[in-house]
Amino acid sequence: MSLNRVIDAKIDKDNPRTAGRAIPAGLISKVETLAFILFSFALLFVSAFQLNMLAVYLLPLAVFFLVFYSYTKRFTWLCHVFLGLTIGIAPLGGWVGATGTLQLEAYLLFFAVAFWTAGFDVIYATQDADYDRGAGLHSIPSRFGIRKALMFAKAFHILSFSLLLWLFAASTLGWVFLVGVLIAGAIMVYEHSLVSADDLSKVNVAFFTMNGVISIVMLIFTIGDLLI
């Protein structure tokens, strides 16, 4: 996130919605932010070498996505998917770190998180559709319009929910996890009911609050399933 803020500092400054972010507002300098980024990358490298060789081999791929995704909105409306893949690396990396393997369940979790993230990022990007279009930036809302963008978001979330169901079927996780998935799916449905092409006033509730709740629900029910 810090790297994204540095890379997008000029864009954030020019966009009225994001001009108040820390770097364009002068609350923190690029040098200070870059120092934090370098420390974070160093910690990532040290951590990977403390785990297993698969984690070490995959480390360059993780770094590539962490750097590359911030540039994607400059040339493709699939930037939301690249962000999703980048965020999806987190649970995939956790799996590799814990097991030293890559199995079907890991890929299902990876893509479930990727499409969930892509979906809510599309919803969030509806706020900047006009600015992005004028600035020559790419996004699904700026390319296809708000109404179709929300359809993309729904499709991404249907894919995510389906992959979570597949993960349940393919793994040893039990009914507690399944209940968590069903609750998460219901929250996704509610999330989409909060926004429409005619009313984006609740975008922040849909983006921040609902997805925060989904994260907590999945964490609690997954841990609960493993403990029971």
Residue ranges and their predicted role:
Residues V56-A62, L66, H80-A135, I146-L159, ...:
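Functional transmembrane core segments of multi-pass inner-membrane proteins
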Residues R21-L108, V189-S196, V213:
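Intramembrane alpha-helical segments
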Residues I11, L54, T72, T76, ...:
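Juxtamembrane transmembrane-helix termini
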Residues M1-I11:
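Juxtamembrane transmembrane-helix boundary signature
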Residues L159, W166-I228:
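Extended hydrophobic alpha-helices typical of membrane-associated regions
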Residues A9-L59, G134-V179:
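Multi-pass membrane catalytic core of lipid/isoprenoid biosynthesis enzymes
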Residues N4, F120, A186-V189:
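Alpha-helical transmembrane segments of polytopic integral membrane proteins
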